[in-house]
Regions:
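Conserved Rossmann-fold NAD(P)-dependent oxidoreductase catalytic core, especially the SDR/UDP-sugar
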Residues: 85-123, 131, 135
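N-terminal Rossmann NAD(P)H-binding glycine-rich loop of SDR-like oxidoreductase domains
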Residues: 5-27
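Glycine-rich "substrate-gating" loop/helix at the edge of Rossmann-like oxidoreductase active sites
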Residues: 140-147, 168-180, 204-207
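SDR active-site strand-loop-helix element
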Residues: 10, 34, 67-68, 102-108, ...
Length: 289
């Protein structure tokens, strides 16, 4: 049997999960991927959110990082059945298997009074995670060299065009976290280097970035001065919602727009320093975009 520590990760095919997986591998962990379509030549088990998980799948696993979230369900009953109940089954299996460290990757979009179904689902999962003895982390907008995810899409949009649609007035506040800072903290907790009790932590630098200012900063790195075309967000939401009701498959959902337009104005960063969670300020000059 290998002496390597084993980390089970869900959502490793996504941007955040992939960053976490890669960092754990660099730190010498053996990775057990839980995925709908396991990649060839990887240690993996077939995993579908919402389905039962056998505790035996976690034999000798030292840590579980739950990053997966299924965006396909659009109605609350479907979201709850897949993502919330699915997380409950996963955490129950992890507890039965006596996994020492469990980490749930929530979202800064999850907060009391949030309006998006995504945020509400994450809140429900947070409660289950805490009851299961998990550490809950709410990352802000995750970025890094060669970024994927939402930040990568923003970079691609600014790079390809000098005319950028602006949903609303661009005043929506974003809090950012470098993928390395996020991954380092998760690994330090999983390895036992950081000893803290199960709690909720917001993983982001405390500097607020208005959405428009963030796009201007990205554009500046390309030497561009973009022109913004304002679009009323409720009109865009209505169009997205209508398309969804017609059964069209979209890359950006109406609920994601609700989340973007209704962020937490005052995330709680009060416990970060004591917990050892350090998030660098966003500096576009230091990125390879």
């Amino acid at each position: 049997m290998s002496d390597k520590k084993i980390c089970a990760i869900t959502g490793s095919n996504g941007y955040v999960g992939g960053c976490v997986k890669n960092y754990f591998a660099v730190r010498g962990w053996e990775i057990l991927e839980l995925a709908r379509q396991p990649k060839p030549n990887s240690r993996a088990i077939k995993f579908q959110l919402g389905e039962e998980v056998l505790p035996s799948a976690f034999e000798n696993v030292n840590a579980l990082v739950h990053c997966a979230y299924d965006f396909k369900p659009l109605r609350w009953d479907e979201i709850r059945a897949v993502n919330v109940d699915g997380a409950k089954k996963l955490f129950q299996a992890a507890r039965t298997a006596k996994i020492p460290k469990i980490i749930f990757i929530s979202s800064i979009s999850a907060f009391d009074g949030c309006r998006s179904l995504y945020g509400k689902a994450k809140l429900e999962i947070e409660k289950i995670a805490l009851e299961s003895g998990a550490l809950v982390i709410r990352p802000g907008l995750v970025y890094g060299d060669g970024s994927g995810g939402m930040f990568g899409k923003l970079v691609a949009q600014v790079r390809k065009s000098s005319v950028i649609p602006m949903i609303g007035d661009g005043s929506q506040i974003q809090f950012l976290v470098h993928n390395e800072d996020l991954s380092v903290f998760i690994e330090r907790y999983a390895s036992g280097e950081i000893q803290i009790s199960p709690q909720i932590l917001t993983a982001a630098n405390e500097q607020p970035w208005p959405f428009k200012q963030l796009l201007l900063e990205i554009a500046r790195s390309f030497g561009k001065k973009p022109k913004f075309i304002p679009l009323p967000w409720r009109l865009i939401w209505a169009g997205l919602k209508s398309a969804e009701m017609c059964g069209l498959k979209l890359n950006f959902h109406s609920d994601s727009l609700v989340s973007l337009m209704n962020q937490n104005p005052k995330p709680d960063f009060s416990e970060n320093s004591q917990a050892g969670l350090v998030c660098r300020p966003f500096e576009i000059e230091r990125l390879k975009v």
